[in-house]
A protein has these predicted regions:
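Hydrophobic-ligand binding "helix-grip"
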Residues: 45, 49, 53-54, 68-115, ...
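Short structured motifs
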Residues: 7-8, 19-20, 59-61, 73-74, ...
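Short aromatic-glycine motifs in intrinsically disordered, low-complexity regions
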Residues: 60-68
Length: 166
């Protein structure tokens, strides 16, 4: 059964009781990474294995995300700033104990690539907050795996160096 969550705004990413923050450097440039995050929403399961499906709303102002474990998020996009930031709030979910959740992806140039930063900001009942804090290392592992998969998806394979064996 889906429940409505507290309608927080972007500033919640800085003030939430629980904040999980992860970052990675990708070889692809910011416009390419941003396109995968914000435009090609349906491609998310191909690089973020915790996600079973991601479908944009008809008006483009939100999306529905289903996780592999059965959790469903109905989301509203809070920021869609090409090549720099993509953020959304969860409006309703079937996840127990959650009261508010916002996620923000920020992109910045890193040489020819992108520094990708993901903030998951949440609030909920005390057991939920504790569980999320304890899950932090696993969420970080999932993020690092997603960043690697996204990087492989966006970066074309290089031809072998002359004289190398393949």
């Amino acid at each position: 059964m889906a429940r409505r969550l507290r309608p927080v705004e972007l500033d919640f990413t800085a003030s939430a009781p629980v904040r999980l923050v992860f970052s990675a450097t990708l070889a692809a440039p910011p416009p390419t990474v941003y396109r995968s995050l914000a435009v090609e929403v349906g491609s998310m399961p191909s690089w973020f294995t915790a996600v079973a499906s991601a479908v944009p709303s008809a008006d483009g102002a939100g999306r529905t995300v289903r996780l592999r474990g059965g959790i469903v998020f109905e989301e509203t996009i809070l920021a869609a700033e090409p090549d720099t930031r993509y953020a959304y709030r969860v409006d309703s979910t079937n996840a127990p104990g959650m009261a508010a959740l916002t996620e923000e992806w920020t992109l910045s140039p890193a040489g020819r690539g992108t520094r990708l930063r993901w903030v998951m900001a949440a609030d909920g009942a005390p057991p939920f907050r504790l569980a999320l804090r304890l899950a932090g290392p696993g969420v970080g592992l999932s993020f690092r795996d997603a960043a690697r998969r996204l990087d492989r998806r966006l970066t074309p394979a290089r031809p072998p160096s002359p004289g190398s064996v393949r």
